[in-house]
Amino acid sequence: FFALTAVAQGQAAPAGKASYKFVGAKGCKMCHNTAAQGKQFEIWMASKHSKAYAALASPEAKKVAAEKGIADPQKDEKCLKCHLTAYKAPKEMLATTYSIEDGVSCESCHGPGEKYKDMKIMKDKKLAMENGLIMPDEKTCKSCHNPERPTYKEFKFEEAKKLIAHPKPKAQG
């Protein structure tokens, strides 16, 4: 599991594991913004995750950073590792649709989407997972939501999970 989380955060894949490109939120939007998919993209856009990178430019973030001796939170490793997807990923792992402006996007939790984003693969969960899809769990969240974070508040996984829930609606009929 750690290896998958490391890849989702943009670190190199361990030996013997495939490396896939990060396609960015745009790569997910086409399919995951439909009513049939529960408007999952809109749910993400309304979340703090989508604004995580931009939040580092706020006066509050700059104040917290200054207290920690950080000059620019939008350029510091301690901040970026949790405020954007694919931090430290080599350029060859970033598709042209990837953008740091996406903040903590789909691929932060679900892994690089290059291979599993195709509809024919996503229709089969097992096949999608074989092509890099990660089904996140509490450890995934706690890789960032932990006491090392300067603005940490107690993290209650079951409550947090409800705030970011984006299930696919059950088929009608």
Language-model segments: which ranges?
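Sequence context of c-type cytochrome heme-c attachment sites
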Residues: 8-102, 107, 113-136, 155-173
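Alpha-helical multi-pass transmembrane bundles of energy-transducing inner-membrane proteins
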Residues: 137-144
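C-terminal segment of classical bacterial N-terminal signal peptides
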Residues: 1-9
